[in-house]
Design a protein with these regions (language model features):
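Sec-dependent signal peptide recognition
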Residues: 2-8
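C-terminal motif of bacterial Sec signal peptides marking the signal peptidase cleavage site
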Residues: 13-16
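Bacterial signal peptide processing site
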Residues: 18-20
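Short boundary/loop segments of OB/S1/cold-shock single-stranded nucleic-acid-binding domains
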Residues: 29-46
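Short aromatic-glycine-enriched beta-strand elements
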Residues: 58-64
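A short macromolecule-binding patch
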Residues: 68-77
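Flexible glycine-rich surface loops and low-complexity tracts that mediate binding to linear polymers
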Residues: 88-125
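C-terminal partner/receptor-binding element of secreted or periplasmic proteins
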Residues: 118-141
Length: 141
């Protein structure tokens, strides 16, 4: 059982380094973004890093780079704030750093292929097609 768990964790660690998002265009958001957050408070995260533009796809899913990038699952305590005029700010619950959707960021964490049930709100089918990025520390570029 311990060997299976170790292999599982090694697989997640290795796949977390394989994300390479591309850059999407910058436009005001006409769809209400859906901030998916972990239900579990933690002070650790995976160690991979991805960089790109924080975007919202046509279904309201928040991604990094383009509409085929993994859905971002934000740390426990993360917040979404409507700034008006189609602008939204996300405050990362892991580091308390904030970024406006459309900004270039670097986001720590790692790729996760299994749909998590330990999130709020539940992940919709429209957001579940391209895997998940379990977010850690964030830095605005």
């Amino acid at each position: 059982m311990k060997i299976q768990l170790l292999l599982y964790l090694m697989t997640i660690s290795l796949t977390s380094c394989m994300v390479k998002p591309t850059i999407a265009t910058n436009e005001d958001i006409s769809i209400q973004p859906v901030l998916i957050t972990s239900n579990t408070r933690s002070n650790i995260s995976m160690m991979a890093s991805a960089q790109g533009k924080l975007i919202v796809d046509k279904s309201g899913c928040i991604r990094l780079g383009d509409e085929t990038a993994p859905l971002i699952i934000w740390p426990y305590g993360s917040k979404l704030e409507n700034l008006g005029n189609g602008k939204f700010k996300i405050t990362n619950g892991f580091t308390n750093q904030s970024a406006v959707i459309g900004e270039q960021i670097s986001l720590g964490g790692g790729l996760y292929e299994v749909k998590s049930t330990q999130v709020t709100p539940s992940i919709s089918k429209a957001c579940a097609d391209y895997g998940y990025w379990l977010a850690g520390p964030m830095e605005v570029k």
